[in-house]
Amino acid sequence: MITRCYLEITNICNLDCLFCPKTAREKRSLTPQKFDLLTDKLRGKIKFLYFHLMGEPLLHRHLPEFIAMAREKGFIPVLTTNGTLLSRAQAVMDARPYKMQVSLHSHEGNGKENLQQYVYEAMRFAIEAAAKGVIMVLRLWNQGGYDKENERLLDMVAGYVPRPWTQCQNGWRLADKIFIEYGRMFEWPEGEKSENSDGGAF
């Protein structure tokens, strides 16, 4: 049984990470009307609705509206973000997605942002969102050479949520509803990487 669906609400991203497979498709964002239509078709067929594929969902100005609409239709909304726009994502937090996953390696993939400020914004958001009931997952790669900053990042995170942490299946539980998880870099299902496919969220 299929329990989740990845719905690409935009393929536009504000970063250019080395580990991202990227896309050559036309830059587009889902309209509220199209989102309503697609979620109506998915209603009753899947449980978890992931607002993620190639783009950065926090760039979409209708994201809080989409989260609210998804909840009203019985979906469990989950977001994955590069974390660089969290300082202006209060409306997203207030819309209360079930879970938000923040890729802490977006900094390493670009090498432009101030790392301390990046971690500060991620942790400030995570602590506040968790207090409102949102599960916050901070993601770290464990392969492909992008794990060299892991210990440094963990030490910086510990400055906001001190150790000891509780070890869990894929990483650590830092506090109530705040986790660090290790994972592999994204791979297309069944090796499908063709840009000639008609697939996509649009």
What role is predicted for each listed range?
Residues 1-100, 109-120:
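Conserved alpha-helical substructure of the radical SAM core
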Residues 28-30, 50, 73-76, 94-202:
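Radical SAM enzyme [4Fe-4S]-AdoMet core and its adjacent flexible, acidic
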